[in-house]
């Protein structure tokens, strides 16, 4: 009784859908080859011409047709009418940036008149590429290890710990939290610890530090955003300040999410947070005195002693003074 099916039924017609399609729709039952063959034979029997006749299909020629222009070309001017412009062709599209006959100019960000570096009279820049080139700051920053360096470090650590691909992400979780608390100094040694319930599980730091190229801090910079979110999550449950911020006496808990030494400062970092992070870094490096050279253990400072002493000498380091002896 629904429209338009009611009107179709009054005209002697009725919508048709095959029973095979209904079973597929409501019972999710696939149609087999026998049913398709029987359905095809039935349709051929209903229309004998369907199988024997041939049909020709003619496609429209690939000509560009202008509906407005063709109508004007075929139409004959009426008698007594004045033809204003008989040679007028296709009308120009209306520009949305125009007002009447005045065009609003568009200023380019980079123009060819700008002074540019040149070599042998030719510009060495591709301006079209430069207008579209806007990489992420962290992807080209030298404070972060490249993706290939991080992949090499990750695989080297996994091979050194002899653990599988499925277990490595859990180890990386523990390493990130440990570095938030203890920093990423290249002078760290011994073991780093992660918790398994109430049990401490130690891992050697040697493969972590030795395989970190250029530095461990640049490797851990890949964890910066996740570490920031982790600190924020901990602060939702209880007050949490990383050890890096506790040592620097950071009093504002709202800045705790920036209180770790491998935090990446970007253009989106608030000014107050950037100042606090730089002050903490300056305080951490103030007492550090890096030495280019250490004490060389292969150099001897002893010299050959050519002095000759006798029993008449005043002392082992002083000869006789004309018979005067030390009293």
UniProtKB/Swiss-Prot annotation:
Keywords: Capsid protein, Nucleotidyltransferase, RNA-directed RNA polymerase, Transferase, Virion. GO terms for molecular function: RNA-directed RNA polymerase activity. InterPro entries: Poty_coat. GO terms for cellular component: viral capsid. Residues 65-102 are annotated as: Disordered. It comes from the Viruses. Genome polyprotein of potyviruses undergoes post-translational proteolytic processing by the main proteinase NIa-pro resulting in the production of at least ten individual proteins. The P1 proteinase and the HC-pro cleave only their respective C-termini autocatalytically. 6K1 is essential for proper proteolytic separation of P3 from CI. The record marks 60-61 as: Cleavage. The keyword Transferase applies. Its EC number is 2.7.7.48. It is an enzyme of class 2 (transferase). It catalyses: RNA(n) + a ribonucleoside 5'-triphosphate = RNA(n+1) + diphosphate. Belongs to the potyviridae genome polyprotein family. This is Genome polyprotein.
